[in-house]
Amino acid sequence: SLELPGSELVRDAGCVFVALNYRLGLFGWNCLPALTADPDATGNFALLDIARALDWVRDNIRRFGGDADNITLCGFSDGGRMAAALAGSPLFRGRFQKAVAISGGLSLADPDAAAQKLAENFAPLAVEDGRFADTASAAEWLLTPGSDVREWLCGLEPARIAALGKPATLYADDVVLSRDARSAVPLLL
């Protein structure tokens, strides 16, 4: 990334640098009930992407001269927020040994408030599709755990979702992120 100079870290610190990609915005964080109704479900999709990427790093880093028992997760801004949050996530135990959070905080949204905001963000699309006459009714529907909501959400064109341009945020779901988690690895802020 531009904020983390990977080539300089490799040159000056002698480390192996791996940049991870994950879903962004409304594609990465969506806690509408239709997507999270199962007790083991989470709408923290971006974090699940990071979990899989870290599994790949752990399984393959030796091929690049790295040490699978010495992985440091580092992030800047939102990435720093995620690094700090993941340091306390039980799902991430053993996936990395240290974390660095640069210019990030550790605020987690309340899932109910986040779902309400997401429903308001998606409601105009349901109106455009002719499902409802007004956004209030559409938002109310979007807050239900029905399979019809899930099917509609999963059938939306990605460009329409991206065009919403609305921010999404980390939220405590007690699946990936716990409300009261404490860092299980050394964390440099």
Describe the residue ranges of each PLM region.
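Short, solvent-exposed loop/turn and secondary-structure capping segments
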Residues: 1-3, 28-32, 84-86, 109-115
